[in-house]
Amino acid sequence: MAEKFDCHYCRDPLQGKKYVQKDGHHCCLKCFDKFCANTCVECRKPIGADSKEVHYKNRFWHDTCFRCAKCLHPLANETFVAKDNKILCNKCTTREDSPKCKGCFKAIVAGDQNVEYKGTVWHKDCFTCSNCKQVIGTGSFFPKGEDFYCVTCHETKFAKHCVKCNKAITSGGITYQDQPWHADCFVCVTCSKKLAGQRFTAVEDQYYCVDCYKNFVAKKCAGCKNPITGKRTVSRVSHPVSKARKPPVCHGKRLPLTLFPSANLRGRHPGGERTCPSWVVVLYRKNRSLAAPRGPGLVKAPVWWPMKDNPGTTTASTAKNAP
């Protein structure tokens, strides 16, 4: 008698029918799907006997459900990478490890043009001006906190303007008396020499280098005829000049004492006037008369006149007998 060839679960005869052998038992397709089939981790449906099955680390998928978790590309016949319980294709794996654009928050993959600033990256077209929204790309820009501005918008909103040319100062600016200047605009009004870091003199809102001030602006000293200049950068300079005085005159001859370089100017006439050596006057203390003038060739030195009657001072007789 022939052995019965029946389904292990429903006992239906399997002769002439499709069946599946599972764990040493034979079962019809219907019972296989019901009792033996693995469940797809993607769609949560049984993987029937007539379906293709993909498995990885005790997990099972329909071949059509085995796709990249990012781009949904089918991976049944391709290489893949499992990361954080996700199945990824090679391209998405690269993107997963790639930096994210600060503008669109998408991955920057190999071949994408990008801009990097202080550890942050953007797609080239995502790096735009915070004001006008124009693409900055790889052009010049100015950072302001978390914002970035193109050159034009920065000049309009933030840049100082030169007091001379009224153009924006983007680099190389200087400040003088709380006013901003381009370094190329702050120059000597005469020779156009740059004055930044140099000594200069300001005269009525005009600025001169040291040489031009000496040659063209500075007043000349009445005594030495040299220019009156300051020793530091000031708006006004001064020169210590005494008021002009008439030269002292000899009481006797009424001649300027400058004609007598050897004159001792401390010798004085009793009236307080200075006397040249040729006209030394001798004062007699008692009668306060004047002695006759001595000849120019006979005078050797002026006489010192005592200002007070102190003991031991020169008397009239000693002055008279002086050689």
Swiss-Prot record:
GO terms for cellular component: cytoplasm; cytosol; focal adhesion; nucleus; plasma membrane. GO terms for biological process: animal organ morphogenesis; cell differentiation; muscle organ development; negative regulation of cell growth; negative regulation of G1/S transition of mitotic cell cycle; negative regulation of G2/M transition of mitotic cell cycle; positive regulation of potassium ion transmembrane transport; regulation of atrial cardiac muscle cell membrane depolarization. Changing residue 104 to R: In RBMX1B; uncertain significance. The keyword Membrane does not apply. Changing residue 101 to F: In RBMX1A; uncertain significance. The modification N6-acetyllysine is found at residue 4. Keywords: Acetylation, Cytoplasm, Developmental protein, Differentiation, Disease variant, Emery-Dreifuss muscular dystrophy, Isopeptide bond, LIM domain, Metal-binding, Nucleus, Repeat, Ubl conjugation, Zinc, Zinc-finger. Isoform 1 is highly expressed in skeletal muscle and to a lesser extent in heart, placenta, ovary, prostate, testis, small intestine, colon and spleen. Expression is barely detectable in brain, lung, liver, kidney, pancreas, thymus and peripheral blood leukocytes. Isoform 2 is expressed in brain, skeletal muscle and to a lesser extent in heart, colon, prostate and small intestine. Isoform 3 is expressed in testis, heart and skeletal muscle. InterPro entries: Fhl1 (IPR042997), LIM_FHL1/2/3/5_N (IPR056807), Znf_LIM (IPR001781). There is a cross-link at residue 86 (Glycyl lysine isopeptide (Lys-Gly) (interchain with G-Cter in SUMO2)). A zinc finger (C4-type) spans 7-31. It holds the Pfam family LIM_FHL2-3_N. Gene3D superfamilies: Cysteine Rich Protein. CDD domains: LIM1_FHL1, LIM2_FHL1, LIM3_FHL1. Changing residue 132 to F: In RBMX1A; the mutant protein initiates aggregation of the FHL1 protein causing reducing bodies formation; dominant-negative effect. Changing residue 276 to Y: In EDMD6; drastically reduced protein levels in muscle. GO terms for molecular function: channel activator activity; potassium channel activator activity; transmembrane transporter binding; zinc ion binding. It is linked to Emery-Dreifuss muscular dystrophy 6, X-linked: A form of Emery-Dreifuss muscular dystrophy, a degenerative myopathy characterized by weakness and atrophy of muscle without involvement of the nervous system, early contractures of the elbows, Achilles tendons and spine, and cardiomyopathy associated with cardiac conduction defects. (Microbial infection) Interacts (via LIM domain 1) with Chikungunya virus non-structural protein 3 (via C-terminus); this interaction is required for viral RNA replication. May have an involvement in muscle development or hypertrophy. This is Four and a half LIM domains protein 1.
